[in-house]
Amino acid sequence: GAGAKLSANKPLALIFEGYTTLIRGVPDLVLMLLIFYGLQIALNGITDAMGMGQIDIDPMVAGIITLGFIYGAYFTETFRGAYMAVPKGHIEAATAFGFTSSQTFRRIMFPAMMRYALPGIGNNWQVILKATALVSLLGLEDVVKATQLAGKSTWEPFYFAIVCGLIYLLFTTVSNGV
């Protein structure tokens, strides 16, 4: 994504600019519902036209596709910003030493980019962890769904909401330490 946005190929750069603008501008929950139901409708329209049966998308698959699609836009911006933050002198020095473009990227640009990208990658990871709570709306049995069901069956929804929050806090705290 970042390479496409920085590409000299204007149509490709415009497509990815539109993708990141759209994804970053529309709430995650709305996108999740649009992708889950929209993809299902589109696939069933195709299978109906081909005379085949209906397709039911597994909520786990839908959740993975949706989170990947949404947060791909955020990671695209993280890597684009990191690429642009590397001083041009690094590339000039690599050229002066006779590095090929792939050697320049692998030995100079990528390590330098990662210094700038790591804070954004960590932040995106934290947001993805918390966004997994939204996939329960697609019917996926996750932590939120399990605690919601436990709260309904015991008539103690507040207690289980606190438990759910603590579980997510544990996930994010442990992943911060990694």
Language-model-detected regions and their locations in the chain:
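Transmembrane alpha-helices and adjacent helix-loop boundaries
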Residues: 1-178
